[in-house]
Amino acid sequence: YKRQGYDILFFWVARMMLFGLFAMDGKQPFHTIALHGLVRDQFGKKMSKSRGNTIDPIEFMDKYGTDALRFTLARGANPGKDQALAEDWVGGSRNFATKLWNATRFAMMNGATIQGELPATASLNGIDKWILSRLSETISEVDSLLESYEFARACDRIYHFAWDDLCDWYLELSKESFA
């Protein structure tokens, strides 16, 4: 498997494939090549030092966290399409990570554990059954999207399950049972 931006497809990837097939052992060096777009500035312009529109990923990671930058890039990774990158989008991903942290902390403070088996379905209330059903649907959709290299859609599905279904609905409705 090889991930590569389309800008050097013929200069690098094609050369490696031909070299492997004809100059080495006759085997193709990659079974899959996934082309991704280029990361551009927030206005869709190519990043360059002379324009002054480049970003320092280390700076973004220090300010927003590594996971926020990773999630932003993955969420914009549509196969073969360029993606614009704006600082406020990375900030939004940091807010998403914070939302997940707070939801987990809330659950742990109210007796959730990260080990063991789920209770029998018959003993669950309606809202618990609903969230487990939504989780199962989400896992199935995300697995399918990842298998077809649709990382942006997979991330979007994860985002909406976690933010909308889990945090906005399930946790809010479940708070009464902890009171």
Language-model-derived ranges and their functions:
Residues 27-179:
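Long, charged, mostly alpha-helical binding arms that flank functional sites
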Residues 1:
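Conserved small/polar residues in nucleotide/adenosyl-binding loops
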